[in-house]
Curated annotation (Swiss-Prot):
Pfam families named in the record: MFS_1
InterPro entries, per database record: MFS (IPR011701), MFS_dom (IPR020846), MFS_trans_sf (IPR036259)
Gene3D superfamilies associated with the record: MFS general substrate transporter like domains
Organism of this sequence: Fungal sp. (strain NRRL 50135)
Name of this protein: MFS transporter prlL
Job of this protein: Efflux pump that might be required for efficient secretion of pyrrolocin or other secondary metabolies produced by the pyrrolocin gene cluster.
Length: 495
């Protein structure tokens, strides 16, 4: 049935039947694909369809990632929660700061290893089923951390958590390519990723509240934190299974006209949900394309600041003169500001079709925030707190345009899924592993200069690399236009 449905809505097949056949040339491979030469799509009809999709997809996807990020990063809150009374994670599990860092690193090791297989399974099992499985699993595992009493248990559970959380973010970015055109993705990735900044803000507030539950029913507050924040993921998995739409071809809340419109819109720039591609052929071309490795290297540069802020913001604020539960509460403003900036930058990047330069500008702002934090005196608490807010805003705002830029410059369904997973697995995971080492516990009184210097340097690298890759794409496009005599029917690189 699925196959017949796919054939019915296959653009090439319908083009041949109607006799309205044109071709679109792939600037990368030189291959040509048939398409239907139909009337231009009405802007009003497209807006109505996009809004209908948005209501079903974006809030639910953002909520899923909110819970994922909450369960991933709460170990940073647990580390210092009620430390003054000896009821924190490190004390009760007899872990050193080095042990804690290893436990963080193990998570990202699993994260890097399982992202590509997870994206393959997302396509095979359908998004709603696979994401629901991931969600229930990571929620249960996060709750299991509440029962940890030693270093070995914490490390093993964090590895398992990394396995099941690995597939979510690259999966969601891949998932959006089934529904949205390239110029529509960055802002939607931003709304999803921005839920991580909300999770960071709410995580601090929740930890502050849960801290007052210390020893309730004989259970330490950090254990309550894992239970309270893991349970919603398990419960929500059932909701996701039934309400997350898979593909435009399969949903029943689109009319026949809307479904046809959705498929027409994505004929060139979208992934095909029921399309059976030559996966190995696409995979080989993806693996050997050097410009994609440039994207992965850039993503490595942004991943270290992202992970270090995610895991060490409570520790950083604790080193800024805020003690105990107040340190948890002071993690809220940096994430709140980052949320707003992230949305605005991504909206502008999509509106101007200039993702590379927006990422470069955001990275520069973040680098300046970290640089100022590194050179200011350790006792300049208020100024360094302001710099932390600037650094977080710049670092987080850089990511959605980068991911939108990558996905808009890949031209087959299999390649999109693989490249996104490789970007976050080969680029993101090593960067995030590096991020767990740079904020050294013995530098707390000095203001963590090593962490700030490393993040500043990496963000300056990201800015320069984005500009260089943007110039390369411009050169390639001008060359293609000269060789073809015009841009009609030729697929060019996006900026």
């Amino acid at each position: 049935m699925a196959q017949s449905f796919a054939n019915e809505h296959d653009p090439a097949k319908r083009a041949e039947e109607r006799g309205h056949v044109g071709t679109i040339e792939d600037v990368e491979s030189g291959t040509k694909e048939p398409y239907i030469a139909e009337e231009p799509i009405s802007a009003e009809a497209a807006r109505a369809l996009i809004w209908k999709q948005d209501k079903r997809i974006i809030p639910l996807s953002a909520a899923i990632y909110f819970l994922c990020y909450l369960d991933r990063s709460n170990i940073g809150n647990a580390k210092i929660l009620n430390a003054a009374t000896g009821n924190d994670l490190l004390t009760e599990t007899h872990m050193t700061n080095y042990d804690y860092t290893i436990a963080l690193m193990i998570f990202f090791l699993a994260y890097g290893l399982f992202e590509v297989p997870s994206n393959v399974l997302l396509k095979k099992l359908h998004p709603s089923r696979w994401i629901a499985i991931l969600m229930f699993s990571w929620g249960a595992i996060s709750m299991g951390l509440a029962g940890a009493h030693n270093y070995a248990t914490v490390t093993v559970v964090r590895f398992l958590l990394g396995i099941f959380e690995a597939g979510l973010f690259p999966g969601l970015v891949y998932y959006l390519t089934f529904w949205y055109k390239t110029e529509e993705r960055s802002i939607r990735v931003a709304f999803i990723l921005a839920s991580a900044t909300l999770a960071g803000a709410f995580g601090g507030a929740i930890a502050y509240a849960v801290g007052h539950m210390n020893q309730a029913h004989g259970i330490s507050a950090w254990r309550w934190l894992f239970i309270i924040e893991g349970a919603p993921s398990c419960v929500s998995a059932l909701f996701v299974l039934f309400f997350l739409p898979d593909y435009p071809e399969t949903v029943n809340w689109l009319s026949d006209e809307e479904r046809e419109l959705a498929l027409r819109r994505l004929r060139v720039e979208g992934s095909k949900g029921l399309h059976q591609s030559d996966w190995w052929k696409d995979a080989k071309s993806t693996l050997v394309e050097w410009r994609l490795w440039a994207h992965y290297l850039i993503y490595f540069g942004i991943s270290t600041p992202f992970s270090s802020l995610s895991l060490f913001t409570p520790s950083i604020t604790a080193g800024l003169g805020y003690d105990g539960l107040q340190a948890q509460l002071m993690t809220v403003p940096p994430y709140a500001v980052a949320y707003v900036v992230q949305i605005l930058v991504s909206w502008s990047a999509d509106r101007t079709n200039s993702r590379g330069l927006h990422s470069a500008a955001s990275a520069t702002v973040g680098a300046c925030g970290f640089l100022a934090s590194a050179v200011l005196p350790a006792e300049a608490y208020l100024h360094r707190y302001g710099c932390l807010i600037v650094a977080a805003a710049g670092a987080f705002a850089c990511i959605p345009p980068l991911l939108g830029w990558l996905s808009s410059n890949i031209f087959s369904t299999a390649s999109v899924g693989l490249a996104i997973a490789l970007n976050i697995g080969l680029g993101g995971a090593p960067g995030q592993i590096a991020g767990v080492w740079i904020y050294k516990a013995d530098e707390a009184k000095k203001g963590y200069p090593t962490g700030h210097w490393v993040n500043a340097g990496l963000l300056f690298f990201v800015a320069v690399a984005c500009v260089a890759l943007r110039l390369h794409y411009g050169f390639r496009n001008r060359k293609t236009v000269r060789e073809t005599g015009g841009i009609e029917g030729v697929r060019l690189f996006k900026y």
